[in-house]
């Protein structure tokens, strides 16, 4: 009772995936799926998203082909362009979610989270509106050399959310939200210890990025966290293991 209604070539980004529209013949309900190249960083990124974020995600891999489910939400660029002036917007909740999203990306080293690579999931409640910012592209997991690439706060495309945070939350509140998110990540690390250990061991033996990227990132993180332990790392997998260990202290 399922059939493929349409296949689109998505020309945005650097991967140009196919978007497949699957329709239920019985009730005309439909879902989208994306067909992409199954590069290592993207697969690791999907696994870490499922284990370490508050979001669940499903995908299939066969040889060099990856099939991802569609992640529902308003594209970040569109949300900032059309919804920031909504009178029903809850600025504090939205700013808080951006701080927490920023922290999630940095701790698990997911890079390139500008407004084209995430969506905003808006959930109205009986009193307030809740927001969840979700990554939709994972090909920059543990690849980039610069620390700033793993922090969404440094992308000019995200300036509307960055400015909102500066306007409505204090530095003290921001640090509180960061601590909250790191505590949640620590809980997820413990609850998925076996699966995460398998992934980290595989990543440590895999070459995810040029050695120059590894050397620059471990140096910048050693300075950021004020610990020389990062300097002992020889791969992106080892850097990620060290980053995750810091939230569990």
What are these regions (language model features)?
Residues 127-249:
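C-terminal catalytic region of ATP-dependent kinase domains
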Residues 78-85:
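AlphaC helix of the protein kinase catalytic domain
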Residues 61-64, 86-87, 95-98, 161-165:
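Short, surface-exposed, polar/charged, turn-prone segments marking secondary-structure boundaries
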Residues 59-62, 76-78, 102-111, 141, ...:
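Noncatalytic linker/hinge segments flanking ATPase motor cores
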Residues 1-78:
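Conserved ATP-binding subdomain of kinase catalytic cores across diverse folds
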Residues 43, 52, 104-114, 161-164, ...:
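Short secondary-structure transition/capping segments
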Residues 86-147:
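Conserved kinase catalytic-core segment
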Residues 50-53, 64-69, 100-101, 163-172:
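Short C-terminal domain-edge/linker segments immediately following a structured domain
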């Amino acid at each position: 009772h399922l059939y493929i209604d349409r296949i689109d070539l998505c020309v945005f980004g650097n991967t140009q995936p196919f978007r497949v529209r699957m329709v239920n013949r019985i009730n005309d309900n439909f879902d989208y799926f994306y067909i992409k190249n199954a590069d290592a960083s993207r697969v690791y990124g999907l696994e870490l998203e499922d284990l370490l974020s508050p979001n669940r995600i499903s995908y299939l891999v066969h040889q060099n082909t990856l099939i991802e489910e569609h992640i529902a939400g308003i594209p970040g660029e569109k949300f900032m362009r059309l919804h920031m002036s909504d009178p029903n917007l809850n600025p504090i909740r939205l700013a808080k979610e951006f701080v927490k999203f920023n922290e999630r990306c940095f701790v698990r080293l997911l890079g390139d989270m500008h407004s084209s690579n995430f969506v905003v999931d808006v959930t109205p409640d009986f009193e307030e509106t809740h927001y969840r910012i979700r990554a939709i592209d994972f090909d920059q997991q543990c690849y980039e050399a610069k620390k700033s690439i793993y922090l969404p706060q440094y992308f000019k495309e995200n300036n509307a959310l960055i400015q909102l945070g500066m306007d409505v939350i204090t530095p003290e509140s921001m640090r509180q939200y960061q601590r909250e998110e790191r505590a949640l990540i620590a809980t997820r690390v413990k609850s998925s210890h076996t699966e995460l250990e398998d992934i980290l061991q595989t990543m440590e033996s895999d070459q995810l990025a040029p050695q120059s990227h590894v050397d620059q990132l471990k140096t910048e993180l050693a300075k950021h966290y004020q610990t020389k332990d990062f300097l002992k790392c020889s791969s992106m997998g080892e850097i990620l293991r060290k980053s995750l260990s810091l939230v569990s202290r």
